[in-house]
Regions:
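Aromatic-anchored segments of alpha-helical transmembrane domains
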Residues: 17-22, 106-117, 155, 159, ...
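Start-transfer (signal-anchor) and selected internal transmembrane alpha helices
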Residues: 1-18, 166-169
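Internal/C-terminal transmembrane anchor helices
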Residues: 163-184, 207
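Membrane-interface helix caps and helix-loop-helix hairpins in membrane proteins
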Residues: 115-125
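Membrane-interfacial, low-structure loops and terminal tails that flank and connect transmembrane helices
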Residues: 1, 148-164, 194-196, 204-205
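Transmembrane-helix motifs of polytopic, lipid-linked glycan transferases
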Residues: 78-96, 110-113, 136-144
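Membrane-interface coil-to-helix junctions
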Residues: 20-63, 67-72
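Soluble catalytic regions of membrane-associated enzymes that act on cell-envelope
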Residues: 204-388, 403-424
Length: 518
C-alpha cells in the first residue's frame, strides 16, 4: 500500500514547496515576466512570433500571460513541473523496470523550476524541458507496448511485492530531491563572469549574486508600487532599502518620487547620503532600455507628457509591445489630442486575454479626451518653434515647465532640490525668487532654508530680507554648530542630525565637489 502512494506523497511535497517558492521568494519574477511580454490572439502576431522566435517561445508567452494573476501563474508552473515528475517516473519504470529510489524522476522538475526564477532568462527553457519529458514518455509508452523485453520488465515491476520498510525509501527519495534542489540553487548563484559596457569583464561572487537578487526583488516591488500609485508602499520600500546603506540609482530615484508624494521631499531628502547628486531626481539618457523604461515616470508626474511619451516610446523599442508601454503611450496621446496615434496603441490590447477591459477604459478616455490622474502641464505652450527635451539636464526641463505652469508644485520642489544637489546656489536662488515667494507665515522647508543660509553668506542678510526671504533662528543656530564642528578638520565628529543637512552634503557627499556656483 505504501508503495502505491509514495509517488503521490513526493508529488504533494514537491507541489507545496513549489507554490511556497513561487508565491513568496520568486513572486516578483512571475510578475516581471508577465509585465514584459504580451500574448495576443491575433493572426499576424502569432505568425510573426512563430517565424522570429519559434514555437516554444510562443508557447511560453501563452503560459506567461496567465501570470496576470501571480497565484494563477504559480499554479500553472507548479502543475507543469509536478506533471513532468509523473511523466519521468512513468517513463523510468517502463524503460528500466526499476523503482526510482533516489528520485531521479525529480531532476527535470528541478531543472524546470530554476529555469523560471530568473528575471534575466525568459522561461522558454522550462517549456522545452517539459516537451522533452513528454516526448520521452510517449516513446517509453510505445516501447513498453511493442518491445517484448521492455514490456516483460515493466509487468514484472508492477507485480513485484512492496518490500520492507517503505518509509525509509520514501525518506531517501525526499532527501535526494532536496539535494537536487540545493544543487540547482548552488548552480543558479554560482560565480558568474559578466561583460561590462567598457568592454571588460567582471566576475561576480556567490555573495554578490545573492545580494543582486535581493536588489532585483526590491526594485521590481518598488516599481509595482509606483505603477499602482501606492505611494505609502513605495515610501516604505525605498526607506527600508536606503537604511541598508546600499547604493542604487533606481531606488534613489524612486525614493525621491515617494518623498514628494508624501510631502517630505524638501524635509527628508538628506536623511540618507545623496551620492548620486542630481541624478537622484531623474535618469539621464544613456541609450539603455532599462533607463528608458524608468526615465519617463518623473516626467509623467511633472505633467511633461510629451517628454514622458518620448521615454515610453524608447522603452517600447527596447522591450517590445507590453501592456504597460502600450497603455502609457495611449494615455499620453489622448491627453495631447493625438487620437489616431492613441488608437494604434490601444488596438493590440483588444486581442489579449486580460487587458481587454483596459482597452475599453482607454477607448472611453479617448472619447472624452481626458485621462484620470494625468495632467498636461504644457498644454497651453506654443509648439512653434519646436523645442527638444533635454535628456541630460532635468533642470532645464523643470524651468521650462515652471514658465508654462508656475503653480506646478512638483516642478517647483524638484527644481529647488535639483539646483541644490547640483551645487548651483545662483540658479537655486534665481529660480526661488521667480517661482516660490516666501510664505506670509512660517518658513520655507528645511532643505530650502539650509540653501538660503549659504545664499545669505554670499549676498548678506539685508539683501536676503529685501528679496522677501527670512531664515528661522533654529536653522541659523544649526548652521553655526555645523561650522564649529567643520572647523575641527580631521577631528570633526558630526552628529546624525548634522549629517542629514545640505551643508554636510556639500562638504562630504556631493559628487559635484565642494565648490558652490553663484
Amino acid at each position: 500500500m505504501m508503495r502505491k502512494y509514495q509517488k503521490y506523497i513526493i508529488a504533494s511535497v514537491m507541489a507545496i514547496c513549489l507554490m511556497i517558492a513561487y508565491l513568496t521568494t520568486y513572486e516578483y519574477v512571475i510578475y516581471f515576466h508577465e509585465q514584459h511580454h504580451l500574448f495576443r490572439f491575433f493572426g499576424p502576431y502569432l505568425r510573426e512570433t512563430l517565424h522570429e522566435h519559434g514555437l516554444f517561445y510562443l508557447l511560453t508567452e501563452f503560459i506567461v500571460q496567465f501570470s496576470y494573476w501571480t497565484w494563477l501563474g504559480a499554479i500553472i508552473w507548479t502543475t507543469l513541473e509536478v506533471g513532468a515528475y509523473f511523466l519521468t517516473l512513468n517513463a523510468w519504470r517502463r524503460l528500466t523496470g526499476l523503482r526510482d529510489y533516489i528520485c531521479v524522476s525529480g531532476i527535470p522538475s528541478v531543472m524546470m523550476f530554476f529555469s523560471t526564477v530568473s528575471v534575466d532568462i525568459f522561461p522558454e527553457r522550462a517549456v522545452k524541458i517539459f516537451a522533452c519529458v513528454l516526448g520521452g514518455w510517449i516513446v517509453s509508452l510505445i516501447l513498453s507496448r511493442f518491445v517484448p523485453v521492455i514490456r516483460r520488465r515493466y509487468q514484472a515491476l508492477n507485480a513485484a511485492p512492496e518490500g520492507k520498510r517503505p518509509w525509509i525509501w520514501l525518506l531517501i527519495s525526499l532527501a535526494a530531491l532536496g539535494i537536487y534542489a540545493y544543487k540547482g540553487y548552488q548552480d543558479s548563484t554560482a560565480p558568474k563572469e559578466v561583460g561590462l559596457k567598457n568592454g571588460r569583464t567582471r566576475t561576480f561572487s556567490r555573495e554578490e549574486r545573492i545580494k543582486q537578487r535581493h536588489s532585483e526583488r526590491v526594485m521590481i516591488e518598488a516599481e509595482r508600487a509606483l505603477k499602482q500609485k501606492d505611494w505609502d508602499k513605495l515610501y516604505e520600500i525605498t526607506q527600508d532599502y536606503a537604511a541598508e546603506g546600499t547604493r542604487n540609482h533606481l531606488m534613489s530615484y524612486f525614493r525621491a518620487m515617494a518623498l514628494y508624494h508624501q510631502g517630505k521631499l524638501l524635509t527628508n531628502l538628506m536623511d540618507y547620503p545623496q551620492t548620486f547628486g542630481v541624478k537622484t531626481l531623474f535618469f539621464p539618457w544613456e541609450s539603455d532600455r532599462h533607463c528608458a523604461e524608468f526615465g519617463g515616470y518623473v516626467y509623467e508626474d511633472l505633467g511633461a507628457v510629451n517628454a514622458a511619451q518620448h521615454w515610453e516610446f524608447e522603452a517600447l523599442v527596447g522591450w517590445g509591445e507590453t501592456a504597460t508601454h502600450l497603455s502609457n503611450l495611449a494615455r499620453y496621446c489622448i491627453v495631447q489630442g493625438k487620437e489616431e496615434q492613441a488608437k494604434k496603441f490601444i488596438a493590440p490590447l483588444r486581442h489579449t486575454l486580460y487587458y481587454r477591459g483596459l482597452a475599453r477604459e482607454l477607448d472611453r478616455q479617448l472619447a472624452s479626451g481626458e485621462v484620470d490622474g494625468l495632467k498636461n502641464a504644457l498644454a497651453d505652450t506654443p509648439q512653434d518653434p519646436a523645442r527638444w527635451d533635454n535628456v541630460l539636464n532635468l533642470g532645464a526641463d523643470l524651468r521650462y515647465i515652471l514658465l508654462s505652469d508656475p503653480q506646478n508644485k512638483m516642478a517647483r520642489e524638484y527644481a529647488a532640490a535639483y539646483f541644490l544637489l547640483a551645487n548651483n546656489l545662483g540658479a537655486f536662488y534665481r529660480n526661488l525668487k521667480e517661482f516660490w515667494p516666501m510664505p506670509e507665515e512660517g518658513y520655507m522647508p528645511p532643505l530650502v532654508e539650509q540653501g538660503l543660509v549659504l545664499v545669505q553668506s554670499q549676498i548678506g542678510e539685508a539683501q536676503l530680507q529685501a528679496d522677501g526671504y527670512r531664515i528661522s533662528p533654529e536653522t541659523e543656530q544649526r548652521f553655526r554648530e555645523f561650522v564649529l564642528e567643520l572647523n575641527k578638520g580631521q577631528n570633526a565628529r558630526f552628529t546624525p542630525a548634522q549629517r542629514q543637512t545640505y551643508w554636510y552634503y556639500v562638504q562630504r557627499v556631493s559628487p559635484h565637489g565642494r565648490e558652490l556656483k553663484f
